[in-house]
Design a protein with these regions (language model features):
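Shared catalytic-loop signature of beta/alpha-barrel
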Residues: 117, 123, 134-254, 258-261
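Repeat-unit-sized solenoid/scaffold elements
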Residues: 54, 130-140, 196, 281-287
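N-terminal capping/lid subdomain adjacent to the active-site entrance of alpha/beta enzymes
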Residues: 1-100, 104-106, 113-121, 238-287
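Periplasmic-binding protein-like
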Residues: 7-10, 129, 204-207
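Hydrophobic faces of well-ordered beta-strands that scaffold small-molecule active sites
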Residues: 42-49, 64-66, 97-103, 127-128, ...
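Short, small-residue-enriched loops and turns at beta-alpha junctions
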Residues: 70-79, 103-111, 128-136, 158-160, ...
Length: 287
């Protein structure tokens, strides 16, 4: 608390928390999903974040999120640019796929309302993180102004208190904590409980692209999809780009986490570089 309920202190807490969950699972010889209630589904449905929609479809994904080409200061040109992109995306993926759009904090309230109006015909599943996370009043105003598209946010909100404010003010429809930034799996479970009590779903940021997110997605009933952020170029199989040894990759639009102890990561001890404690000790008390 001394370092605040969010920001870098919470990000640091996240790494420690995830490591402790992995350790607990290994000590108990159980996958982490068994320690947080067990699986509620055989495999988790994924959506992919990528602008390479043809390649994403070829890989078996059925639901999609695209990036943002505009900032609010672009005015009418920005509106036209985004509508052109979303119209093209909808044509490619068809009407039987969920389509999401992420402005990544690039809008103010006025521009977000205009954009939501423009994108009405394309049946977006949600509009993601249009405003900066500190603008609670803006989120409240925006949610009241548009009722035809759900609002999602949370990857840059840190700690359960910021999510509680969103939920208490009914300023959001989808909570998106990032387990590496929000405080870890322990904090994400508390955020999930806050949302669940209010009838709000939680779909963590990039869950399908991390072991901890995969375990969350398979265990939480009110988490109907898991995001897979695809950083690969077209033609490169996902298995060749797996960032963490032992982590499963999506198949046919679904993800199933490892059932190995902990998060199932295969980290070799020789990869870990010991920290030189003497350097820190020698600087103790120095200003």
């Amino acid at each position: 608390q001394r370092f605040g309920a969010g920001g870098l202190a919470t990000v640091a807490q996240s790494g420690i928390d995830l490591a402790l969950w992995d350790l607990k699972g290994k000590l108990m010889d159980q996958p982490v999903y068994s320690l947080i209630g067990g699986p509620c589904r055989e495999k988790a449905l994924c959506y992919v974040t990528s602008d390479d929609l043809d390649w994403s479809i070829e890989l078996g994904f059925k639901h999609f999120k695209v990036s943002n080409p505009a900032h609010y200061d672009m005015g009418i040109d920005g509106l036209n640019l985004v509508e052109e992109k979303i119209a093209s995306a909808r044509e490619i993926v068809g009407n039987n796929s969920e389509l999401m759009y992420n402005p990544v904090m690039s809008f103010n309230v006025e521009f977000a309302i205009r954009m939501a109006e423009r994108l009405k015909p394309y049946g977006l599943r949600w509009l993601e993180e249009p405003l900066i996370p500190t603008d609670l009043e803006g989120h409240i105003e925006l949610r009241k102004a548009i009722n035809w598209v759900p609002l999602a946010t949370g990857e840059d909100h840190h700690g359960r208190w910021t999510f509680r404010q969103l939920v208490e003010n009914r300023a959001v429809d989808v909570l998106q904590p990032d387990l590496k930034w929000c405080g870890g799996l322990s904090e994400a479970l508390k955020i999930y409980a806050i949302g669940e009590a209010a009838g709000i779903i939680t779909i963590p940021h990039a869950a399908a692209a991390s072991p901890w997110g995969q375990h969350f997605a398979i265990s939480m009933p009110e988490s109907p999809m898991a995001e897979f952020w695809m950083g690969s170029d077209p033609g490169i199989p996902l298995e060749e780009l797996c960032p963490i040894p032992g982590m499963p990759m999506p198949k046919d639009g679904y993800i199933k986490p490892s059932d190995a102890p902990g998060f199932g990561m295969e980290i070799k001890e020789e990869w870990i570089i010991p920290w030189d404690h003497s350097d820190a000790s020698n600087n103790t008390g120095k200003r």
